[in-house]
Every structure is written in C-alpha cells, then in structure tokens.
C-alpha cells in the first residue's frame, strides 16, 4: 500500500518509468509521433528535429502550395486550350486532311505548270512522272468503282469461251501462227535472214524444255503462249516502235543520271580519286544507294503497288496462281532472296510446281539493286530495263512447261494476297535500313568477284599448262565454253563470228556469276567504242552492236551455281519443313531460269535492229570480209568519216567518233572523190 501511495497521487513528484518512456499523445497527434505511428520507434530521427526547421518547412510548404495552385490554374488553361483543338481536329479530321492535301496538290500542279512554261525541256521528266501518276490514280478509282460490274458483265463471254474453248483455241492458235509467219516473211524480206534464226532458236528451246518436262502431258499451253506473247508485245513496243524505244532510252538516261548522285557519297568517303579504283569505289556504292531508294519506296507502298499491278496482268493473261505471279513481278524490282518474302505467309502452302516457279523466276531476273551497278559498267540501261521486264513472263512460261502443275493451288484468288508495308517507323529509318541491308550484298559481290576471278585465273593457268604439252598454250576455260556453248549463242541470233565470244560470256555467267560476264562484256563494248583493232594476236577484241545487245539479254539473270546455293538456303530458312521439296527443285529451276534468259535473248534477236554504228561497220564489213553488204550504209558511213576527219599534214590526221586511219584508207579505196584521198598515206 505504501509503495502504491508513494507512486500515486499522494506523491506527485514521482514519475513512473513506464510513463516516462511514452511520448506525449498530443504531440503524436500533431507531429504524427507516438503509438498512433509505430514507425516512429523504428526511425525516430525522421520525426524529430529542430523547431526552427519545422517552422521554416511549414512556411516553405505554404509557399509551394500557393505556387502549385497557380501552376495548376495555368496547366488547366493550357489543357483546356489544347483539348479544344484536339476535339476540333477529331470532329473535322477528314475535312482538314482533304484541305491540306488539296492545297499541296494545287501548289504542286502550279509548280509543274510554271516549270513547263519557263523551261519545258528541263521539266519533261517531272511532267511525265506527274501524268503517269494521274493516269494510274484515276485508273485505280475506275477499277475500284466499276471493276466488279465489268467482271459481272463479262461473265457470259467467259462462260461461252470456257464451254467452247476446245474448238475456239484452234482458231486462235491458227491466227497466231499465221501472224507469226506473215511477220517473219515481211521482216525477213526487209531486214534479211538475221531475224529468222532466233525465231527457230526460240522454238528449239521450248521443244527442249517440253521434251525434258516433269509431266509433258500436263503442260498448260495457255501459260506458254501468253508468256511468249507478253514477251513479244513488250519487246515489240520497246524495240520496234519509236515511242517505246525513245521512252526506254529516255528512262535509261534518267536512271543513269539518278545513279550518278552516288558519286557524291563516294567522293566524300574515298576522295576525289575514287574512280581510280572504279569497281570498288564507284560501282559497289551504287548498290548501297539503290538499295536505300528501294527500301524507301517499299516503306511508302510504291513497290507493293507496282508489284501488284504487274502480277495482276500476268495472272489474268497467263492464268498462273497469284503466288507465282506476285513473285515473278517482284523479281523485276527486287532480288531472288527478297521476292519470296512478298508471299512469306503462303510459302508453306505452295505446290511443288509453284515452288519451282518461284525459284525459276529468281534465276531468270536480276535485282534492281545491282541493275545500277551493271549500268555503271557501261552496259546499255535501256537493254537491261527491257530484259528485266521481258524475263518475268518468260520465267513463268518456261518453268510451267518444265514442271507443270498437277495439283490445285490453295490460294487461287488475288484477293487472298496482302502485301505488307515496311515495318520501319518513318522514312529516315527505312532509308537507313536499306543502306544497312546492302552491306552484306556488297560484301558478297566483292568477295565472289575476288574468289571467282582468282579461280578463273588458276583454271586458265592450269589449262594453259596442259595445252602447252600439245603446243597449244592458248587453251583456257573461255575457249572450252566458246565451243561447247557456241550453238546456244548462235541460235539466239548472234552473228557467227561473234557467237564464240558470246558463248564465253554465257560460260562465265553460268559457272561463276553474271558480274564477271558483264565486266567482260563491258570491256568488249569499250574496245568497240574506242575504235581499236578488231584482232590482237589473233584474238577478237569486240563484237557487233547487235551481238552486244543479244548478249545483254542472255546474261540478265541470276542463273548460276553460286545463286543456286543462295536460293536453296534462303527459301529453306523461310519454309524449313519444305526443305526437301526446295532442294529437289533446285537444278531444274536453274535450267529453267537459264533457258528463260535465252528465250528473252531470242525475242530480242528477232526484234532488235541496231542503229548504224559506222566504226564497227567499217571495220567488220570492209576489212574483215573484204566485201560490202549494204552499199548505202557504207557510203553513209564513209561520208561521216570524211566529215569527222581533220588532216593538217599527211602524218597529222585526227578523227572523232571512233574512226581511224585504216578506215579512212578503206573508204578512199571505194570513194576516192569524197575526200582528199591523194594526200592520205596508206598504212
């Protein structure tokens, strides 16, 4: 009891030690300390501090709250303003878009019209591109609105043809055969027999493909006839009509001009003397530039639009499946490994005949990215562009003859195909991605050229060593190819004397790659244009312009053994469970792609008529054969030679356009009155 009293109210000075340890509850309410806030006991320093500091922080908090209130008011006003703009845009989105687009179009058309008024010649390219874009824009609108109605209206005609095609087809085939015979008769009477040989060469190649076909009885001749007909129509428009020839020549010049902009990057990176190492520093950078442009076009959807249009044309005429048509059209613009990506979701469902067709199309054409490189070597751009277009239907025709379809395609309508746009976020990323994607391609080209040229040199050295044992040290890989492949070159319409050189190029392209062959062809072109001697140590140095053109078409494809491995590897990675089917198609697809290129060359041989190139005519006609074929051409060329000759003294004579003293002496023999020939000293 006393102890209790000692600790009770009777002893107010006494402090209970337990009570002493407890904090003031009023303080706990104010400062968040005490039993109501158990974390205080764990970290009391967080809640205890100087009273002055507490007062100061309270003042700061009040000021911050006032600032936050002011800032919140401003933010609310800004948010309200932008919210109003956003809502207005959402309500009038279409009107704003169309208004903005209309203003852009009005400004663009005003620019085009003003440019044409000020300088029509310089504005021609812009005008042509604008008119083409307008035409296809309204064409798409027309088809979108009336396409189904037109198809519905034509259904009775289609039904009638399907029911009576077994009879009608003989009239169609007879009319086509009669037209071909009349064409060849009239053309041969006018041009000579050079155009007849490639026609029979084309028939020979088709017969060979048919004889060795996988299923000869299953060949659909509609595909073959329409494929060849599309080839012929494309070639006729481009090679025989002046508007078509001028258009593709103009297009070739524009492409060459466009590719010249690559020099800016090459000069910056490699210096002003970059062309001293022409192939490495001038040709290969073009591949990077072209790949960049193609990637940008793909991002914008232009490539997909072009591919769909060309693929649609081949599908409705030839009757091939949408998959085959799209890949064949895509190969005009992209490479053999990129074009299958267009139908990547459908690769697993392709029939084996469709797979063979996809591979054949890749072998029969070249990629747009390397097209510029070939042009930079001096290969005529118009011929390369024409060959790229003509080989697309040829690949389908030959491949479907070599391996006909025996099953029904799972994707038989064009509406089942959807070509995706690029996955890049913007145009700059697309350009960067395209440039980066070209780096492995450039490295692959450079590595293959180094390897193949080295291997070719070794093979030639070995063959020369073997040949020297029989007193024939000239024996080489080129000579073997020139004799083995000479009949194929001759049947394309190449002159007999040039067929051995073209056969060499075919061998290089098939066993090495087309870059090696085109590089050698560019040397022949340069030798001819420089007006050098036709023979050096008994070796022919160049060929005729017509033979160069036919060779350009025959070489325009990836059909070589190196590409075979690339094709099988690329397709196998896209469709792993179809690897055995892909491998089984490989060799046949390679042969089909090669013959497709040959058929394109045959069509070119039938249609192509070279412009009169006087230095070549004078060298080959006057001094190789000793007789003239066309006196009118000879006289015209000699007249041009006399006009281009400047004679200061008998020993000081200058020429232009590839002429030389040998040609002058020859022309003086035939037309002595046309020039002061008495002053010319014979060589």
From Swiss-Prot:
Q: Which UniProt keywords apply?
A: Cell membrane, Membrane, Symport, Transmembrane, Transmembrane helix, Transport
Intramembrane segments of this protein: 325-343, 503-522
Its localization reads: Cell membrane
Which cellular component terms (GO) are annotated to the entry? plasma membrane
The residue ranges for the Extracellular side of the membrane come to 119-123, 190-192, 243-279, 380-381, 465-502, 523-561, 609-683
Specify where it is mainly localized. Answer: membrane
The name under which this protein is listed is Solute carrier family 28 member 3
Q: Which organism is it from?
A: Eptatretus stoutii (Pacific hagfish)
Taxonomic lineage is: Eukaryota, Metazoa, Chordata, Craniata, Vertebrata
**Gene transcribed to yield this protein:** SLC28A3
């Amino acid at each position: 009891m006393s102890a209790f009293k000692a600790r009770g109210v009777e002893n107010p000075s006494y402090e209970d030690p337990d009570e002493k340890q407890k904090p003031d509850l009023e303080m706990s309410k104010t400062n968040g300390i005490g039993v109501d806030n158990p974390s205080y006991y764990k970290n009391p320093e967080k809640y205890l501090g100087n009273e002055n500091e507490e007062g100061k922080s309270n003042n700061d908090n009040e000021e911050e709250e006032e600032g936050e209130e002011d800032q919140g008011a401003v933010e609310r006003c800004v948010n309200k303003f932008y919210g109003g703009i956003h809502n207005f845009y959402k309500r009038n989105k279409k009107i704003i878009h169309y208004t903005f687009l209309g203003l852009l179009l009005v400004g663009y058309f005003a620019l085009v019209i003003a440019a044409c008024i000020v300088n029509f010649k310089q504005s021609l390219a812009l005008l042509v591109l604008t008119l083409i874009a307008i035409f296809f824009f309204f064409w798409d609108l027309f088809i979108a609105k009336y396409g189904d109605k037109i198809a519905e209206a034509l259904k009775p005609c289609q039904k009638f043809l399907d029911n009576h095609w077994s009879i009608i087809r003989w009239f169609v085939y007879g009319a086509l055969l009669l037209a071909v015979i009349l064409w060849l008769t009239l053309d041969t009477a006018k041009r000579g027999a050079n155009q007849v040989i490639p026609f029979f060469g084309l028939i020979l190649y088709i017969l060979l493909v048919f004889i060795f076909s996988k299923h000869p009885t299953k060949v659909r001749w509609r595909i073959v006839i329409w494929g060849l007909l599309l080839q012929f129509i494309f070639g006729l428009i481009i090679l025989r009509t002046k508007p078509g020839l001028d258009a593709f020549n103009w297009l070739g010049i524009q492409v060459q001009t466009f590719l010249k902009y690559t020099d800016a990057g090459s000069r910056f990176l490699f210096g002003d003397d970059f062309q001293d190492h022409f192939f490495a520093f001038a040709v290969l950078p073009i591949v990077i530039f072209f790949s960049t442009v193609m990637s940008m076009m793909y991002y914008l959807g232009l490539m997909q639009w072009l591919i769909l249009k060309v693929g649609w044309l081949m599908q409705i005429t030839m009757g091939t499946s949408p998959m085959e048509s799209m890949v064949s059209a895509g190969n005009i613009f992209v490479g053999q490994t990129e074009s299958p990506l267009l139908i990547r979701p459908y690769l697993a469902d392709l029939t084996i005949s469709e797979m063979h067709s996809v591979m054949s199309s890749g072998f029969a054409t070249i990629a747009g990215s390397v097209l510029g490189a070939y042009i930079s070597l001096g290969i005529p751009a118009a011929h390369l562009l024409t060959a790229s277009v003509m080989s697309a239907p040829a690949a389908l025709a030959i491949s479907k003859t070599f391996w006909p379809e025996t099953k029904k395609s799972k994707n038989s309508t064009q509406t089942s195909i959807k070509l995706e746009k690029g996955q890049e976020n913007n145009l700059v990323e697309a350009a960067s991605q395209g440039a980066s994607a070209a780096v492995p391609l450039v490295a692959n080209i450079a590595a293959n050229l180094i390897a193949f040229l080295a291997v070719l040199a070794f093979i030639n050295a070995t063959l020369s060593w073997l040949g020297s044992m029989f007193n024939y040290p000239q024996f080489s890989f080129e000579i073997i190819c020139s004799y083995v492949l000479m009949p194929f070159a001759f049947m394309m319409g190449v002159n007999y004397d040039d067929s051995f050189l073209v056969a060499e190029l075919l061998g290089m392209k098939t066993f090495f790659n087309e870059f090696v062959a085109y590089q050698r062809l560019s040397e022949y072109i340069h030798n001819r244009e420089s007006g050098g001697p036709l023979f050096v140590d008994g070796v022919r140095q160049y060929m005729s312009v017509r033979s160069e053109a036919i060779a350009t078409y025959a070489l325009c494809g990836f059909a070589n053994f190196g590409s075979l491995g690339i094709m099988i590897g690329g397709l196998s990675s896209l469709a792993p469970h179809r690897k055995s089917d892909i491998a089984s198609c490989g060799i046949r697809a390679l042969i089909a792609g090669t013959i497709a290129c040959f058929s394109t060359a045959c069509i070119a041989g039938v249609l192509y008529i070279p412009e009169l190139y006087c230095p070549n005519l004078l060298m080959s006609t006057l001094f190789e054969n000793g007789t003239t074929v066309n006196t009118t051409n000879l006289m015209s060329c000699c007249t041009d030679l006399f006009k281009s000759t400047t004679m200061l003294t008998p020993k000081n004579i200058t020429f232009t356009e590839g002429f030389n003293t040998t040609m002058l002496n020859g022309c003086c023999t035939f037309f002595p009155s046309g020039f002061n020939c008495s002053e010319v000293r014979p060589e």
